Amino acid sequence: MKAVRYHSYGGSDVLVYEEAGRPVPGVGQVVVQVAGTSYNDADSGLRAGLRQDMLPLALPHIPGLDLAGVITALGEGVSEWRVGDAVVALLPADAPGAAAEYVAVSAEALATAPHTVGLADAAALPLVGLTAWQALFEHADLKPGQSILINGAGSAVGGYAVQLAAQAGAIVTATAGARSRDRVRSYGADRIVDYAVTPVVQALAGQHFDVVLQLAPAGPEENAHLVDLVADGGAFVSVTTPGPQDAGRGVRAVHVFGRSDAAQLTELVARVDAGELVIEVAERLPLADLATVHARAAGRFARIAELAARAEGGVLAERLRADPAAVRAPAAAGELVGKTVLTP
């Protein structure tokens, strides 16, 4: 089968579109013919080896955390799925990914794919949708009537977060630029702050929110200012760089990494099919173009990585110093904007 793989950690140039062995299902697994996968900045982090101390990969590695496709084979012990079922899943980061024609995946990770959108487009849902859900309802414990600031609402996670928070009955203030402002408003935001006109902290000076959800890359100083916007007893939840606790005011600071959860993904799919949740796809490309997609995201990813290294220090900072080309490769023409779906 055809797949994109990398045989060593590094920049986008280590990604190779090549022949790879077709997987067979293990016990409790199914094989899925991939209809689509999508790019996430986490894919660049794994490719660059930034977390190899915590999450070493067996090389060569097939990337692609998001999966949408059709089951073609069942492993021993799988009874709840059938060949021909259309499914979506968030794959383990250290397992072979969906940037291939076929992938083996645990049956327990699967959810039935939405039937109201194209199957390939459904690959834009798992990681970012689950991250938004878990940030809001597991970590922030968002309740109806609470106020929330979503910083970076124009991002892929932000789009889902605005929709879910509004549907939960929260009062949503969202930051967005001119490019995404109308879309974010259509998702249910009660108020839009244009960060390009006035810095967020300045625009919201003196206001407080039960929850601040940080989706934009930021350094420790900016995160500290955002924590100041959290009401006493509230939560600062970040999916980018961590923020400081404010124990004196009872403010919790949580750093979120999205994880696979089939039940939550099933709920997200149900909302898509009910017309309550919009899957936004900015671009559709052939899988062979994945290296170009990584290159187009290089500028944004480099900033995220460098800010994370400033915030965390330690091994991550050392790794960036040792191999700066892994994250600072020149971006290709045309910066990556929105969610990109890739099809074999």
Labelled PLM ranges:
Residues K2, V16, Q33, A68-V70, ...:
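Residues located in well-ordered beta-strands
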Residues T173, R185-V254, A305-R310:
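Glycine-rich cofactor phosphate-binding loops and adjacent beta1-alpha1 units
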Residues G10-V14, E19-A68, W81:
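N-terminal glycine-rich beta->alpha transition that marks the start or flank
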Residues M1, L265-P344:
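C-terminal hydrophobic helical "lid"/dimerization subdomain
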Residues V31, A68, V88-A89, A104, ...:
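Hydrophobic beta-strand signal
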Residues L125-D194:
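Mid-domain Rossmann-like dinucleotide-binding core that forms the NAD(H)/NADP(H) cofactor-binding site
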